[in-house]
């Protein structure tokens, strides 16, 4: 099976590993993305974290409430300078207003604002992209924006201050699910199988490995779920414990961050200047 550039890029985005590592991993698994990720974790090829400069595109996250829902929008540009430009922000807010008016789909937003986008690109000189729009329903919603780059909306049954603090926690801690039991069964099963294999590779018997994995799995589902995480304002307690104390409940949340999954090209300014000088000498 031929491995495509798109597959390699997806694996790079998800693991932070090098291009050749990703291509080799996909070749070995005949294009099976999930198996490639598991194999890379075992071999240590996947990096623990990706450099922010390799994934962070610029732009803004905007939030606006509609009737019984909230809209979250990401609009991208190429530089942080343009992200603060009044023309760019006016365009982004116009798109947001349309989205919040009637839950317009991303495709319809792109079509509706294509002429305005093209005009803005011509005026500013950078590529502009309406990247994402998400909607969250709820009679009781609280939002939080961390600068221009992170936006969170939380839906739940709690007082305004509690929901606001939970939204701030979501912004900082990046949970993927509300509760540990919300983690899909296939994700749990895959992680459990991987942990058992890794434990046995450490020389543990199958019986001991399974017991060790029980604790690891509780930690795994807790770390990626909101109520299982340590609360940033009281780290000795989980978010779930804080909510229980307050008689509160979170039913859903959405968190968007500018540039998630986008690899931003590293610019070598010195090399660029040298190339320009060399070109001018040839002219």
From Swiss-Prot:
CC annotations in GO: cytoplasm
Q: Which GO terms describe its molecular function?
A: translation elongation factor activity
Q: Where is this region: Involved in Mg(2+) ion dislocation from EF-Tu?
A: 79-82
Pfam families with a match to the protein in the record:
EF_TS (PF00889)
Keyword list, A-Z: Cytoplasm, Elongation factor, Protein biosynthesis
Question: Entry's InterPro entries?
Answer: EF-Ts_dimer_sf, Transl_elong_EFTs/EF1B, Transl_elong_EFTs/EF1B_dimer, Transl_elong_Ts_CS, UBA-like_sf
Task: Read off the SUPFAM superfamilies from this record.
Answer: Elongation factor Ts (EF-Ts), dimerisation domain (SSF54713), UBA-like (SSF46934)
Location in the cell reads: Cytoplasm
| Listed PROSITE patterns | EF_TS_1, EF_TS_2
PANTHER family in the record: ELONGATION FACTOR TS (PTHR11741), ELONGATION FACTOR TS, MITOCHONDRIAL (PTHR11741:SF0)
Q: What does this protein do?
A: Associates with the EF-Tu.GDP complex and induces the exchange of GDP to GTP. It remains bound to the aminoacyl-tRNA.EF-Tu.GTP complex up to the GTP hydrolysis stage on the ribosome.
Please give the family membership noted in the entry: Belongs to the EF-Ts family.
Please give the name of this protein.
Elongation factor Ts
Organism annotation? Shewanella baltica (strain OS155 / ATCC BAA-1091)
What gene is this protein translated from?
tsf
